[in-house]
A protein has these predicted regions:
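Conserved beta-strand signature within the Rossmann-like core of class I S-adenosyl-L-methionine
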Residues: 196-204
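Class I SAM-dependent methyltransferase SAM/SAH-binding core
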Residues: 93, 99-166
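Conserved Class I S-adenosyl-L-methionine
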Residues: 6, 213-233, 243-291
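N-terminal auxiliary segments of SAM/dcSAM-dependent transferases
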Residues: 1-53
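A short acidic, Gly/Pro-enriched loop at the edge of an enzyme's catalytic core
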Residues: 165-176
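Class I SAM-dependent methyltransferase Rossmann-like catalytic core
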Residues: 52-75
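Conserved alpha-helix/loop element of class I SAM-dependent methyltransferases that forms part
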Residues: 69-88
Length: 291
């Protein structure tokens, strides 16, 4: 884990900022200590938490293969543009990040305006400073995914954390918060996002992967309304863009897009897939804090 990211992370026990203590170990001022994995990531889970299902190695591998072939490039470009336009200081926080693919693309486009320190949410610009590159944090419940995310980008740190609980991130640390096909925790999002920050949410629309309906979980037609209801009144909708494109998928591609998400748990391992022309339909929306 990068040392300059640690102050952006919070102890899951007492919520104090983390740092290097006791000869290099990661910990907080109240004496709570956390082991850093050899891959470089941290596990910051609350002591008591609900039993949740995390992505399996098979799901993570399928996602890396599928995204690595560029099939969701329109989403990557849209998120990169949002991050590149961000003006608030702070990190790019990808919640439910998986292996960090979207975060890595976003960081390649990200610079902090006016030379402000890349990770400090409340620092002022040094005299004569120039823009520097953003830092990022990938957060996911899956240790398998986070091990991959720790290697996704040189300017990214990776944390195993529970999206449904208090996020192990200090108040106002995020300039941009990415939520791509992930569960949402609007109370925590409002807490960790900078007052001038942006929340970017990607949700599937009706018709997304429709040609694979027999093998994938269907999209709730009320999903957009439920998104709006879940984020207000803490957030105000700033923009919404519908993206639709056609993907020419090989049999392996179809296997991977089915198995990289929740449908993995509902499809037999020996299912044989055929090449297919498949529609992708998502909404990319941005939201700003109302506080």
């Amino acid at each position: 884990m990068r040392d300059d990211l640690l102050p952006m992370l919070a102890c899951p026990v007492c919520a104090e900022p983390l740092g290097r203590v006791d000869g290099g170990q990661v910990g907080c001022p109240n004496g709570h200590r956390f082991d850093e994995a050899k891959q470089g990531h941290l596990t910051l889970l609350p002591a008591k938490r609900r039993a949740l299902t995390a992505d399996t190695p098979e799901m993570v591998d399928a996602r890396l293969r599928f995204l690595g072939r560029g099939h969701y490039a329109p989403v990557e470009r849209a998120l990169a543009a949002i991050v590149a336009d961000a003006t608030a200081p702070g990190v790019v926080l990808d919640v439910g990040s998986g292996p960090g693919t979207y975060l890595a693309h976003a960081l390649d486009a990200a610079h902090v305006p006016d030379g402000r320190p890349v990770a400090a949410p409340d620092a002022s610009a040094p005299a004569g400073g120039r823009p520097g590159p953003r830092l990022g944090v990938a957060l996911d419940l899956s240790a398998v995914a986070i091990r991959r995310a720790a290697r996704a980008h040189a300017r990214a740190g990776a944390v195993v954390g529970d999206v449904t609980e208090r996020l192990p991130v200090v108040d106002g640390a995020a300039a941009v918060l990415l939520d791509v096909f992930a569960p949402r925790n609007q109370t925590e999002y409002a807490r960790v996002l900078h007052a001038d920050g942006v929340l970017a949410v990607v949700t599937p629309r009706t018709g997304h992967l429709a040609e694979l309906a027999e093998a994938t979980i269907s999209v709730d037609p009320e999903k957009e309304r439920r998104l709006h209801d879940s984020l207000t009144p803490s957030f105000a909708l700033r923009s919404s863009e519908d993206l639709t494109w056609t993907m020419e998928l090989s049999a392996e591609d179809v296997h991977d897009v089915v198995h990289m998400g929740p449908s993995h748990h509902h499809v037999a391992a020996d299912t044989v897939f055929e090449p297919a022309t498949v529609t992708a339909a998502v909404t990319v929306s941005t939201w700003t804090p109302t506080r």
